[in-house]
């Protein structure tokens, strides 16, 4: 068995580096498979009285602002301390919020700091069609020019399954995720929209919006750009309601939370650099199950299977999220964070070295969650969806019950037992500017320990500081003369057999 440090608690963005004399508490747990247990998370209220939040994002302009999209057709700005009274944008009568319709997403140009451009995704109040429109900021940085340009409309026959996500990929193209058209079983198979490549419903679209003199152009690398009878905007297909998808800001991988029918919710995956063209299966498959809405599957169709599924036992609808790449919760690094709308549970999915995915509950809430958001630093936010003043935005934080600045995972617990995989030990790492780093940790008599260090948390980069450390039943202090000063370090202690 091994005791593995989960990470370094921090009170600011970025990884903790000891540039002055100080103490860091590092959580440690016992694990038979050497994998980190999920951190204990909590939610910190950052903005309230926000009715029916549908999306949370940032502009990438260094301002630190969050832009909160409301279903009724408004975009609000949270400036770090308060929600500004004046709307950033108000679509007015262009859209009407209700059910699954309304203003659903906002995406800012990668060059927003200089060009001031952003795009919105909404359902048109006149006929329910899906609309993507381009807007720009006014001379006031906190107010948009109300005059926009619709770049794409998609007829949508039913009020649900509108999709709703807009996001720029690492390639600079704008991705959009319209749903399959609504009702159940893809309009009961009358048009089989998600598998019909002549339609844009039930797809992931990829658009080049860099030329503002036109609406959009087709990226030449789109998979169906040369196929007759196929809409060239299509990047992937076979999706039911890809309500939320996101790109991993570190790897560029794409993760799609696709809302299921009556049995299975799923997360679909696409590696960075993929040529596109994936068929994610709907309505031939739901999750891993073939034939939910059809009489079996067609043998000559290749379906890309989801990486994760969960059933409807107490749950109903996935709200896709992000892979965590912030600095405030190191043990959450690389974890795909998502939720279920009905249960209010927030989950974390991790990928093993072998490539398989597994999921665990990170925290449970008492409210409906429709969306996650990522700020410019990679910290994650989640909404409380409500049609009254209870609507709010929260930031995911490392739980700190007593408010002393140290997460609960780093606090010494009564009856701490290094042999109990549910127990935590207290570790103190001290990094003065003119001496060796030292690490202090609790021990048990007649047990042997090994102290290890890494500077980057890469699994293969752990080095042994000291081996065969004999436990005494009291805390031991071990020096690490090989650790550079003025540098961040991560430590773990292994309980040897």
Language-model features: locations:
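Conserved blade-ending motifs and adjacent loop-strand segments that build the rim/top face
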Residues: 356-376
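Surface-exposed loop and turn segments in beta-propeller and other repeat-based domains
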Residues: 86-99, 147-162, 200, 211-235, ...
């Amino acid at each position: 068995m091994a005791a593995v440090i989960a990470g370094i608690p921090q009170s600011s963005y970025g990884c903790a580096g000891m540039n002055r004399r100080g103490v860091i508490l590092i959580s440690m747990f016992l694990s038979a498979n050497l994998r980190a247990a999920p951190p204990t998370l909590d939610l910190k209220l950052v903005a309230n009285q926000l009715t029916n939040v549908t999306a949370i994002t940032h502009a990438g302009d260094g301002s630190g602002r969050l832009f909160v999209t409301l279903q009724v057709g408004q975009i609000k700005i949270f400036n770090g301390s308060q929600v500004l009274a004046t709307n950033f944008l108000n679509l007015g009568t262009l859209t009407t919020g209700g059910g699954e319709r309304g203003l659903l997403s906002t995406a800012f140009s990668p060059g927003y700091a200089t060009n001031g451009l952003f795009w919105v995704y909404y359902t048109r109040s006149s006929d329910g069609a899906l609309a993507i429109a381009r807007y720009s900021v006014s001379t006031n940085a906190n107010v948009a020019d109300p005059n926009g340009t619709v770049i794409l409309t998609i007829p949508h026959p039913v009020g649900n399954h509108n999709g709703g996500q807009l996001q720029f990929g690492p390639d600079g193209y704008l991705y959009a995720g319209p749903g399959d058209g609504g009702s159940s079983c893809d309009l009961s198979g009358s048009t089989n929209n998600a598998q019909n490549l002549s339609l844009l419903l039930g797809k992931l679209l990829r658009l080049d919006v860099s030329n503002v003199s036109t609406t959009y152009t087709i990226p030449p690398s789109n998979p169906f750009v040369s196929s007759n009878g196929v809409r060239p905007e299509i990047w992937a297909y076979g999706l039911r309601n890809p309500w939320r998808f996101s790109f991993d800001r570190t790897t560029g991988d794409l993760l799609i939370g696709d809302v299921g029918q009556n049995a299975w919710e799923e997360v679909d995956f696409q590696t960075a650099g993929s040529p596109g063209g994936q068929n994610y299966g709907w309505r031939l498959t739901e999750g891993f199950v073939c034939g939910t809405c059809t009489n079996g599957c067609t043998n000559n169709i290749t379906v890309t299977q989801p990486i994760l599924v969960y059933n409807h036992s107490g749950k109903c609808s996935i709200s896709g999220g992000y892979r965590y790449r912030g600095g405030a919760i190191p043990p959450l690094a690389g974890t795909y964070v998502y939720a279920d709308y009905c249960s209010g549970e927030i989950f974390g999915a991790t990928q093993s070295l072998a490539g398989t995915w597994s999921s665990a509950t990170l925290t449970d809430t008492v409210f409906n969650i429709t969306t996650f958001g990522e700020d410019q630093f990679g910290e994650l936010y989640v909404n409380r969806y409500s049609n009254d003043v209870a609507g709010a935005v929260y930031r995911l934080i490392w739980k700190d019950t007593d408010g002393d600045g140290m997460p609960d995972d780093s606090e010494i617990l009564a009856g701490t037992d290094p042999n109990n995989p549910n127990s935590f030990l207290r570790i103190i790492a001290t990094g003065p500017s003119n001496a060796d780093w030292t690490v202090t940790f609790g021990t048990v008599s007649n047990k042997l320990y090994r102290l290890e260090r890494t500077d980057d948390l890469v699994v293969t980069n752990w080095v042994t500081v000291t081996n065969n450390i004999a436990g005494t039943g009291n805390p031991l202090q071990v020096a690490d003369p090989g650790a550079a000063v003025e540098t961040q370090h991560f430590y773990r202690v292994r309980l040897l057999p």
